[in-house]
A protein has these predicted regions:
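Short glycine/proline- and charge-enriched loop/turn segments
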Residues: 72-73, 116-122
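Conserved TIR/SEFIR loop-to-helix hotspot centered on a Trp-containing motif
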Residues: 67-96, 106-108
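Short acidic-hydrophobic, aromatic-tinged amphipathic segments that line or gate anion-handling sites
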Residues: 123-130
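Hydrophobic/aromatic beta-strand patches that form the interior of the parallel beta-sheet core
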Residues: 62, 99-101, 125
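Short amphipathic alpha-helical segments
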Residues: 22-24, 74-77, 112-114
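Glycine-rich, charge-decorated loop segments at or immediately adjacent to ligand/cofactor-binding or catalytic sites
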Residues: 106-118
Length: 186
């Protein structure tokens, strides 16, 4: 029988606008933490049940906030399929360590609905393609409460200039090449 994995971190993001950024961060952290990342490890079952269970078990909830992340939320306040809002509202209700990662934006929308408005009072590092290593270290050292698992992958100790992939833009390009166009629209 397969052992059930308990996730440390839950990734929430709007497919299409920050998929590549979420994937790049997942690639960097996956050897250090158990991450609930839908395109990697959500299989069959009732989606709401799986998502709620994963949020319940995680310590950290990372939400990638890009320019249009909350457009769907603001346009229809009762959209039952707005998973970004549903996930965020549940994580806030459960008092998870919610870490917003702003992706190429400076501010949150001003008129968020009450069940998720508290996100405006949460802090997180701003996503940075160019200084990706510094961004990841800041996230790990100052925002994540989950403890990293021991690893024998020494790439994180290799100087950036000697790595095969040096920054998030290169990660994203490499990763997006492995996606089909259908994956990007989900």
């Amino acid at each position: 029988m397969e052992q059930e994995i308990i996730h440390d971190i839950f990734f929430s993001y709007r497919h299409g606008n920050s998929s590549g950024d979420a994937r790049a961060l997942h690639e960097r952290l996956k050897n250090l933490y158990e991450i609930s990342f839908d395109v990697e490890n959500i299989y069959s079952g009732e989606l709401p049940d799986i998502l709620y269970k994963r949020i319940d078990e995680c310590t950290d909830f990372i939400i990638f906030v890009a320019k249009d992340t909350f457009d769907r939320t603001l346009n229809s306040l009762d959209d039952k399929d707005d998973w970004v809002r549903i996930e965020l509202a549940y994580a806030l209700k459960c008092n998870k360590n919610v870490i917003p990662i702003k992706v190429r934006i400076d501010d949150f929308p001003r008129n968020l609905p009450p069940d998720i408005a508290q996100i405006c009072h949460k802090s997180g590092p701003k996503y940075d393609d160019y200084y990706f290593d510094a961004f990841v270290e800041k996230l790990r050292n100052y925002f994540l409460k989950s403890k990293a698992k021991p690893t024998y992958d020494f790439e994180e100790y290799i100087p950036v200039e000697k790595r095969k992939v040096k920054n998030a833009a290169e990660y994203r390009e490499t990763i997006l090449q492995s996606f089909s166009p259908i994956d990007l629209l989900r």
